[in-house]
A protein has these predicted regions:
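N-terminal subdomain of nucleotide-sugar transferases
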Residues: 1-38, 77, 215
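Carbohydrate-associated surface elements
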Residues: 35, 153, 173
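Short N-terminal targeting/anchoring amphipathic segment
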Residues: 72-91, 103-108
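Active-site proximal beta-strand in glycosyltransferases
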Residues: 81, 98-118, 148
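Membrane-proximal helix-turn-helix segments that form the acceptor-binding/catalytic region
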Residues: 100, 112, 128-146, 161
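A short beta-strand/loop micro-motif in the catalytic core of glycosyltransferases
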Residues: 142-151, 168
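Acidic anion/phosphate-binding donor-loop and adjacent secondary structure
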Residues: 174-191
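Conserved donor-binding/catalytic core segment of Leloir-type glycosyltransferases
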Residues: 187-216
Length: 218
């Protein structure tokens, strides 16, 4: 994964929870990512772009890694299975390597085309979204036999766009600190509903729909 240290986006949060769950089941997990080196991490440099492009990427809470074949070969030689989180330049380079060496590999689908197209103000264009889905499919995901989907909605989208891998729907999960603990409402909240929106402040998250719904609620 390109970014593992800062949990400011859903892909990174999912990767960290996935890694922890594997560790809890007795597996050893290492990651390739930007940031500082660690016992569990093979560090690679962060890509730099022109200011406008840099802003578009960081506004999504993401950083992209510079593909480093030497570092990836070192990590892949240690691993029994390599799991890919995104069709990023690092992921595409790594996929070619594991295919060449015959190392078992799986993928997750966390980067929806809408994450990209809404940032470019083209999120409502079905043609553009379909183009990105198809590019992801043909250049990356149809080279896997198993894909982790965080929701049924994602799995359905992949089926509709001709993805051929076996799809496994597994929720990203909820941290224990966010588990609902029932308590009495404060007096000023009696008779009112609490509506919570969780997610980045980004176009594809459609906070505008929630605001419109609240305005029309009774």
């Amino acid at each position: 994964i390109d970014q593992f240290d800062d949990a400011n986006n859903g892909t990174t949060i999912s990767a960290r929870r996935f890694a922890q769950a594997l560790k809890n089941h007795g597996n050893e997990v290492r990651v390739i990512a930007t940031g500082k080196p660690a016992d569990y991490k093979y560090a690679v440099r962060q890509m730099r772009f022109f200011p406008v492009v840099e802003h578009l990427i960081t506004s999504q809470g993401m950083r992209l890694a510079v593909p480093n074949r030497h570092v990836f070969e070192k990590a892949a030689a240690w691993a029994d299975v390599v799991h890919f989180m995104m069709p990023s330049p690092l992921g595409i380079m790594g996929l070619k390597h594991v295919e060449k060496l015959g190392i078992p590999h799986t993928a997750a689908f966390h980067c929806q085309p809408e994450n990209i197209t809404f940032t470019l103000h083209m999120g409502n264009s079905r043609r553009v979204n379909d183009f990105v889905y198809n590019r992801f499919r043909d250049t990356f995901f149809n080279r896997f036999t198993h894909i982790h989907c965080p929701s049924n909605m994602i799995a359905n989208q992949l089926r509709q766009h001709g993805y051929t891998a076996r799809l496994h729907v597994i929720s990203n999960g909820i941290s224990p600190e966010h588990i609902y603990g029932k308590r009495e409402k404060e007096p000023w909240m009696q008779g009112l509903f609490n509506v919570l929106m969780v997610g980045r402040y980004a176009g594809e998250k459609r906070q505008d729909e929630l605001i419109d719904a609240c305005a029309k609620s009774r």
